[in-house]
Amino acid sequence: MKKLGVNEIRKEFLEFFRSKEHIIHPSAPLVPQKDKSLLLINSGMAPLKPYFAGLEEPPGKRMATCQKCIRTGDIENVGRTARHATFFEMLGNFSFGDYFKKESLTWGWEFVTKNLELPVDKLWATVYVDDDEAFEIWNKQIGLPEERIVRLGKADNFWEIGLGPCGPCSEIYFDRGEDYGCGCEECKPGCECDRYVEFWNHVFTQFDRDEEGNYHPLPNPNIDTGMGLERMACIMQGVDSIFDIDTMQDILNSVCKITSSEYKKDERTDVSIRIITDHVRSISLMIGDGILPSNEGRGYVLRRLLRRAARHGKLLGVNRAFLYELVDRVADNYGETYVELVDNKDYIKRVIKVEEERFMETIDQGMDILNQYIEELVTLKETVLSGVNAFKLYDTYGFPFDLTKEILEEKGLSLDETGFESEMEKQRQRARDARIGADTEGWKEDIFSGLDKEIQTAFKGYTNFEVEGKVLAIVSNDTVVEQCDKGKEATVILDETAFYGEGGGQVGDIGTLYNEAVRLSVLDTKKGPHNQVHHVVRVEEGTIKIGDEVKAKVDMVTRMSTARNHTATHLLHKALRDIVGEHVHQAGSLVTPDRLRFDFTHFEGLTKDQITQIEEKVNQQILMALDVRTFETSIEDAKKIGAQALFGEKYGDVVRVVKVGEYSTELCGGTHVTNSGEIGMFIMLSEAGVAAGVRRIEAITGMEAYKYVQKNQKTIQEIADTLKTQVQNVVERVADLVHETKEKDREINKLKSQLASNSTGDILDKATVVGGINVVVEVLENQEMDDLRKIGDVLKEKIGSGVIVLGSSNQDKVNFVAMATKDAVSKGVHAGNLVKEAAKIAGGGGGGRPDMAQAGGKNPQKIQEALDTVKEILVNQLNQ
């Protein structure tokens, strides 16, 4: 048996199937393309679903891939078992109606016995209990003895997910030997012990399951196989754990070095090391595919993995950002196959570091909250933190549950784990409710996928704004209908159209479908499967029927406004890269007739000077009236001429290029102006952060920009009229007013301080002694919180030793301030608890430090009652 590394096994597999006339398809990005049912690519077959479902034509009948995958369903097991990981690679060979069982199994056997040189006597196979064909291939054609072919039932060897394509499967197993077994004489594949390792599953998609549970033979059966690369590496390298294979070991050793930890000395330490090793691979590859940390969707998965890894670094004694330092090792081991790790390495490191540093702040914030909870438990003489509070720490502040538990245990306290789990289940249910209708593997079809594949639309709208088309299909209320009457809404599919379907961030066209007998308002246009263009319509006049010939007329005003904004996004993208840096990539966009929104990768807000430069640069290109050219070319040639691609996007072999003069070159399928001068004017409205490492610009062009300037001019003129000055003098006049106001504020504050100082003498005369401590409790009239604090500071300085509690009502609001000198605090006084309890009586709350605190209330009538309790609370504090 050969001893091959991960990269060598991958290369052997792909080259073997290249020799079997398979197209070697590069791994798809982890972000599913055109598939809203999946959060992340989680299997080798997932990116190929459109081919298996017949929605798209595959590039060839035979394909082979090595697909990067992310799964987090068993995240709690990662690092604690030998085989669980969040990132893994799936090797697979696929046939779309070409070869079937015989070729799939015989080639599989050839690869593992000839290329990998696995010992024949160590190999077993399983087949579906009723699949005699597969059994015969294994036994008669390949020569595997009957006793090493195991028939298993539907749960093990039949692949199906709800309705649709399904079929039996056959798996190849490796026998690790009796030392790994359960000792049972009947031990064989299918046993729960660790002796037999399944490493290659061959799925024979030969049936179509209907709603009644009947299985109908498919006219063109498919092959879908999957081999876990890490699992095969374990076999080839003779190790028991995926964390001991070559690529993982290289990263793991770096983890040990950075964290000053030793592997295989302590199991708790080992778990943390393994979690970091696994998670940093997932994190790096996700960011490399354009995913960024956020609080929802795949961004939340990334954030959770990153923070979990950082948390385990903290358990190993690392109290700084460190994960980003491991990206070099990930790129060294995986960068040859996944070049985005190398191309975007600095960017990946920057995103990780920023998120790590944010998490460090979160941990500190969470500790402050947890300490407050602990303080409350001690005060109330309780020992169990509620599940609600533990969940709030976890959900709101990102504070890990196990860290909360550990800290509580150190202080002799515990937490209500049942209550915490109850809150977690409520959150899971909310997530499930939000996912209703989305199948786990994403095989659910809509009404349009079931239409005849011949129903396709030829898009003619790049150069035409009105074309004639024939109605091929009408869908109303999720039902295919023959006609649609006046007043009703439907989706209409034509054989030809000028309407652009929503895509690439650009909204769909609106307009009219009409002939002499019927008129339909097109409210929106969307792309559908099988090259369909969906016209979302309302029938204004007549009845639309299948077979009708209509004219499809795009609304020119909105189309041109959208085109201006779309071309402007290209100019903006290039200007950002010129002025801010080459690290800027498009992270998303929205192009509408009214405005454009452009998300880009960057880690800090743009300066005023940068914004000015960007706006000027874009407007310069507009004034230069550059020709806008579009053409189709190969993806390789597009890259050679420097065409910018969307970060994390997957493109076909032929792409559409949009060039604005010699200034901007991008891959784009949208509609554009023919000359940059048609944009007219470009104005940035705002620039802000939307996620870690992602900024957003909103801007306007054309008439919207002109109206904006006009409105601002009118506003400035009105300000000038109000200030009784000329427009050119407005800024100077406002600056004078601001200066005058500040001077008056200073005078007012000075007078307030004098009044406060003068009034403190009378207040101090009312001081009483409680437990040997001077205490001042006083109600003052109409004082804001700042004023109360100033008076409190003066009193604290004059009293020398003691406690001051002041209250004041202002309209419907109550303010409280409490202060205590150092010696009073040392005797047990806690200003925060004093003011918190007092504020409760006045319908409010608050708190703070032992020496200074403030609170608010909503019931001015209770202010005196609240302050009357202060001395009683003080006595209790001193007696504890």
From Swiss-Prot:
Binds 1 zinc ion per subunit. It is an enzyme of class 6 (ligase). GO terms for cellular component: cytosol. One of its GO terms (biological process) is alanyl-tRNA aminoacylation. Zn(2+) binds at H566, H570, C668, H672. The keyword Transmembrane does not apply. Its EC number is 6.1.1.7. Coiled coil: none annotated. GO terms for molecular function: alanine-tRNA ligase activity; aminoacyl-tRNA deacylase activity; ATP binding; catalytic activity, acting on a protein; transferase activity; tRNA binding; zinc ion binding. Catalyzes the attachment of alanine to tRNA(Ala) in a two-step reaction: alanine is first activated by ATP to form Ala-AMP and then transferred to the acceptor end of tRNA(Ala). Also edits incorrectly charged Ser-tRNA(Ala) and Gly-tRNA(Ala) via its editing domain. Consists of three domains; the N-terminal catalytic domain, the editing domain and the C-terminal C-Ala domain. The editing domain removes incorrectly charged amino acids, while the C-Ala domain, along with tRNA(Ala), serves as a bridge to cooperatively bring together the editing and aminoacylation centers thus stimulating deacylation of misacylated tRNAs. This is Alanine--tRNA ligase. The lineage of its organism: Bacteria, Bacillati, Bacillota, Clostridia, Peptostreptococcales. The gene is alaS.
